[in-house]
Amino acid sequence: MSSLLIGYYSKTGNTKAMAEYIAAGAREAGANVDLLPIENVTVPSLLSYDGIILGSPDYYGGMAAPVKQLLDDSVRLHGQLAGKVGGAFSSAANIGGGNETTILGIIHGLLVHGMIVPGVAVGDHYGPVSINAPDERVERQCKKYGLLIADIARRLKDEG
């Protein structure tokens, strides 16, 4: 059984709702999930997870400051997160408002750590996105993403 962290920053509740859907999908796959506001995530705790998924609203085409701060502070663990599975998700107010650039910014930080970040062949390719409050499509994408990350984390753990 794999253990996942889903850390998120949410001002309006939209990103939190996405995180909850992702957690539901991961739990369906049998993962132990810690669902935490980003302010409650500590850098040392990142070592205890097989997979780390971070979510942020889009702020001017990038991630919220608390998410960026966690990634910046995680430099203390450089190299120690290599081989873990990572992922990202985002919400925004507008279509074309910066969801993908926000997700890619988070993914860049995960890749620098040597984490494995899978793409999604059908749907939201870089990770789930929502425009305003998550609708049924977003709920499906989030649950599917949680299943995907949990399954990969479990397989890697079983092989390791």
Where are these predicted regions, by residue range?
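Extracytoplasmic "Venus flytrap"
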Residues: 10
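FMN-binding flavodoxin-like domain, especially the glycine-rich phosphate-binding loop
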Residues: 2-5, 14-160
